[in-house]
Structures are given as C-alpha cells and as structure tokens.
C-alpha cells in the first residue's frame, strides 16, 4: 500500500490510478490536480495541474489508446482535459457547457471513441466527443431538474439488428447506455438513439428517499445487468435487468440502513464484488450468494 502524506493543502475528493497502475491522479478543494508516479511502495510527485477556479471533485483517465490523457471536473462548472507528452503535462481542452458545479465525469468504454460523460448541478448531463481535428461535439440532456450528482456508462455491448440489404442478415450495432443519479432521488437510464442523434430516457428507477449520491454499472457483460445506487438516505439499492426488454428489479442490499450517508459505490473488475464508501469513514465489501442475497465480504482497512 502506498501512503501519500500532505499531497494537498485541503480535502482530497478523488484519487485514481491509470490503466497500468503506474500513475496516480488526485484532486482537492485546493483547486489543483496532482500527478504521482507510483512504483511498488514508493511515489514521486510529477506535476501539479492548475486551471480550475474551485474545488476539483473528480478525475478520470482516458483509455491509453488515446494517449496519456486525464479529465477533471470542478465546482467552477468546467471540465478540463489534460495530456502528457514527453513528460510534460498541459491543458488541451476545456468543456464549458454547464452553468453550475460539474460533479461527476467518466470516459466512455474505449470502443465508442473519446467520449466523456459529465453530470452537473444545473440539472443537465453532457456527452462530449473529442474529434481528431481538435473540435468537440457535445450532446446536452435535461436529466434531473434540481441537479445531477453522478453518471456512469454501461459496459460496451452489441445488439443484433436486421440488415436492410437483400441478404436479410443481421449486423451488430453498438448499444450506448448510461445511468444517472440526481437530487430528485431518482436513478435514470439513457440510451443513444441514432435517428434523434441524442440520448433518450429509457427507464426511471424510483426507490430512494433522498439524494442519489453515486451510481455504478457492473462491468460484467452477462445476460443480467447489475446497477448499484447509493444515497443520502443511507441505503444501497441493487437494480437488475434480465434482458434488454425487461423492467429493472429493485433489491435493497441490506434491510437496515447504513450508519451514515453512502457516498460512493464501485464494482470490482470482474463485477462480483461491490465496494461501498460510507460517511462513517468505512469501506465495506459485498457479494451476491447463490440464493441471490447480498452478504458482507469484508471491510477495507488501512
């Protein structure tokens, strides 16, 4: 375990390793993003990225096929894109379509290209495509009327669609979906519609009695899809869908409430373990048993 002391002068809100686990990006209320090189149990500060004018809530690494690229989002309403070339970091783009704090960002599955999803307190969610000529093409959606707190892509999937040609064969098409959570206590699922050239609301999931703080779509591509949502109401709901046509089934992770607000949810890479971050400074692990019940699988300690 690597421990970095005094990394920032104020509260740290996010810390994310890159694809290879060699670089660590952190962000803070001190308005900065910091990049560390990590080797074994040692670390070295490489650069401090300055450009935001408010607390920086989240960072996310792009897939390495696009280069060494990092996105950051802030209370200042901006999403900044940073790139490292020959050991030097610089800001290469700014996404400034939101009128309030941008609370969450996530790069799409790399199969979709350089697409970035952002959720804002202005109630809107944006998907911005970064094109090779340096221009951007944003899609802006009215998602949650009193604020969008979080957004997460579904794993990349293909859907068979009938070919209009004479062969009558089927050609697989990308199915781009993401989930959002808002201050309206709702979880919403959105799907790209090529005819409308935007993302349309597919499902609205009701179950929380307070702000939805985080949503996480399991990375496992199986016949059943899993979503986790956590809330200010101190509950975690697991949502499952057995096929693309079915409705989503709601299951409380546990009957009694957690001791404090649940802030973050994160699936393991294999999708079988769910980690939950609670306001009482604990991180608990959960897994589904053979009967479909969720049970504790441990606790993360220092």
Curated annotation (Swiss-Prot):
Residues of the signal peptide: none
Q: Name one GO molecular function term.
A: structural molecule activity
Q: Where are the WD-type repeats located? A: 7-46, 51-92, 97-138, 160-200, 207-249, 257-296
Provide the GO biological process annotations. COPII-coated vesicle budding; mRNA transport; positive regulation of TOR signaling; protein exit from endoplasmic reticulum; protein import into nucleus
Alphabetical list of Pfam families matching this protein: WD40 (PF00400)
Membrane topology label: Peripheral membrane protein
| Gene Ontology cellular-component terms listed | COPII vesicle coat; endoplasmic reticulum membrane; nuclear pore outer ring
Purpose: Component of the coat protein complex II (COPII) which promotes the formation of transport vesicles from the endoplasmic reticulum (ER). The coat has two main functions, the physical deformation of the endoplasmic reticulum membrane into vesicles and the selection of cargo molecules. It also functions as a component of the nuclear pore complex (NPC). NPC components, collectively referred to as nucleoporins (NUPs), can play the role of both NPC structural components and of docking or interaction partners for transiently associated nuclear transport factors.
Its assembly, as annotated, is: The COPII coat is composed of at least 5 proteins: the SEC23/24 complex, the SEC13/31 complex, and the protein SAR1. Component of the nuclear pore complex (NPC). NPC constitutes the exclusive means of nucleocytoplasmic transport. NPCs allow the passive diffusion of ions and small molecules and the active, nuclear transport receptor-mediated bidirectional transport of macromolecules such as proteins, RNAs, ribonucleoparticles (RNPs), and ribosomal subunits across the nuclear envelope. Due to its 8-fold rotational symmetry, all subunits are present with 8 copies or multiples thereof.
* Family of this protein: Belongs to the WD repeat SEC13 family.
Name of this protein? Protein transport protein SEC13
Which species? Kluyveromyces lactis (strain ATCC 8585 / CBS 2359 / DSM 70799 / NBRC 1267 / NRRL Y-1140 / WM37) (Yeast)
């Amino acid at each position: 375990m690597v421990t970095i002391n005094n990394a920032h002068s104020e509260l740290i809100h996010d810390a994310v390793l890159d694809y290879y686990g060699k670089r660590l990006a952190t962000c803070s209320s001190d308005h900065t993003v910091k990049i560390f090189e990590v080797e074994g149990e040692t670390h070295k500060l490489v650069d401090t990225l300055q450009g935001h004018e408010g607390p920086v809530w989240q960072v996310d690494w792009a897939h390495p096929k696009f280069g060494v690229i990092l996105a950051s989002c802030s209370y200042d309403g901006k999403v900044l894109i940073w790139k490292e070339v020959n050991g030097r970091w610089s800001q290469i783009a700014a996404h400034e379509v939101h009128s309030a704090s941008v609370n969450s960002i996530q790069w799409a599955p790399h199969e979709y290209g350089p697409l970035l999803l952002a959720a804002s307190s202005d109630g809107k969610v944006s998907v911005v495509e970064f094109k090779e000529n340096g221009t951007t093409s944003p899609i802006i959606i009215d998602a949650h009327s009193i604020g969008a707190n979080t957004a997460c892509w579904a794993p990349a999937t293909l859907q068979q669609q009938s070919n209009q040609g004479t062969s009558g064969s089927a050609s697989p098409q990308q199915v781009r979906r993401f989930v959002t959570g808002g201050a309206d206590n709702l979880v919403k699922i959105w799907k790209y519609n090529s005819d409308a050239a935007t993302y349309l609301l597919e499902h609205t999931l009701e179950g929380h009695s307070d702000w939805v703080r985080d949503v996480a779509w399991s990375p496992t591509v199986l016949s059943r899809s899993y979503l986790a949502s956590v809330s200010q109401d101190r509950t975690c709901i697991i949502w499952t869908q057995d096929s693309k046509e079915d409705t989503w089934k709601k299951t409380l992770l546990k009957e009694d409430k957690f001791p404090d607000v649940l802030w973050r949810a994160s699936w393991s890479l294999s999708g079988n373990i769910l980690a939950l971050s609670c306001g009482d400074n604990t991180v608990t692990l959960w897994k589904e048993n053979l009967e479909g019940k969720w049970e504790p699988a441990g606790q993360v300690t220092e």
